[in-house]
Regions:
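Rossmann-fold NAD(P)-binding glycine/threonine-rich loop
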Residues: 1-10
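Contiguous beta-strand/loop segments that form the cofactor/metal-binding neighborhood of enzyme cores
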Residues: 25-26, 37-38, 43-48, 52-249, ...
């Protein structure tokens, strides 16, 4: 889709909204100004999933509800009898329909981190989790992406936690300080060579830790270009203006990382990624056939008549 958008010069936008937020812009300015030095680690944690995961396929079919075209709802996914465990909303936890917690929320927070840290394609992705199941994502998972040096930026490792998992509490926090957002229990932590930034899940309410450093902090100039707003960017692009910041071309790399993370969770190991050829080139501790199984998940087969030409 990103390639077609480039070739046709069609305006595109992914509705993540972070690209237009003050929080993302300020975090990007702090990192660019070297407030905490070169960032070597980024941590991002979510309370999700709050839908069922780590379950088996139900054995007993149920009557299809009136008004639901079950075959149409399945689309390209393999056929199966109807059961309420698949919809609505709860489809997120199933391999054939969703991408688990990382797919549900990673597109938002990763948008912020990809901008602030100038990230592109990872070279390696590793995952571990609670017990794995044949068709659903686990209850909790840890995913780690290794990104190489970019322009003037050092290599960085991005760590994701879901299922109520989170990184160790920073020693810089006072006992009465909250590590996670008090409303949703989620957060983001950027670790640099000269300090740490703690913020909400998508980069909001950023602050330096310890608190004493934040009190003495003199922010860098707020001089990055400001967005008129995500909707305004979209309308302007339709009318022939600049491409939206959250274009398919930019978000392609975000989605690539998220999907690689989900594949690593399903495989339960480390994957080495060849971004140029868009393929997994090695599966750590792989059994015979694991590399083929992992690569098949990049472009899974589609049920007729939903094939793509």
């Amino acid at each position: 889709m990103a390639q077609v958008a480039r070739e046709t010069k069609v305006a595109t936008q992914v509705a993540v909204m972070n690209e237009a937020s003050k929080a993302t812009r300020l975090l990007t300015e702090w990192i660019a100004a070297g407030v905490i030095g070169q960032v070597r680690e980024a941590h991002n944690w979510s309370q999700r999933p709050y839908w069922p995961q780590g379950i088996e396929r139900p054995k007993d079919p149920e009557p299809v509800p009136d008004g639901l075209d079950w075959d149409l709802w399945l689309g390209p996914a393999p056929a199966r009898p109807y059961n309420h465990v698949y919809l609505p909303f709860v489809w997120r936890g199933w391999f054939d329909f969703g991408v688990g917690a990382i797919g549900d929320m990673g597109n938002y927070s990763f948008d912020t981190m990809f901008r602030a840290l100038k990230l592109a394609s990872p070279v390696r992705v590793d995952a571990s989790s609670t017990p794995r199941f044949p068709e659903t994502y686990p209850v909790g998972s840890l995913i780690h992406w290794e990104f190489p040096a970019r322009e003037d930026r050092a290599p960085v490792t991005l760590h994701w936690y879901d299922g109520d998992l989170r990184p160790p509490r920073p020693a810089e926090l006072e006992p009465d300080e909250h590590m996670s957002d008090v409303e949703d229990g989620e957060g983001m932590l950027l670790v640099g060579e000269r300090g740490k930034i703690l913020c909400g899940f998508e980069g909001q309410n950023a602050r330096l830790i310890p608190a004493g450093r934040m009190k003495a902090f003199e922010p860098p100039p707020d001089d990055l270009p400001k967005s008129p707003g995500a909707y305004e960017e979209w309308i302007g692009a339709i009318r022939g203006g600049e491409s939206p910041r959250a274009s398919f071309e930019f978000e392609q790399k975000v989605v690539e990382a998220v999907l690689l993370g989900s594949i690593a969770v399903r495989m339960g190991t480390t994957l080495e990624w060849d971004a140029e050829h868009e393929r997994i080139k090695r599966v750590a501790e792989g059994r015979a056939g694991d590399l083929e199984i992992a690569n098949a998940q990049i472009n899974p087969p589609r049920r007729a008549p939903w094939e793509l030409a």
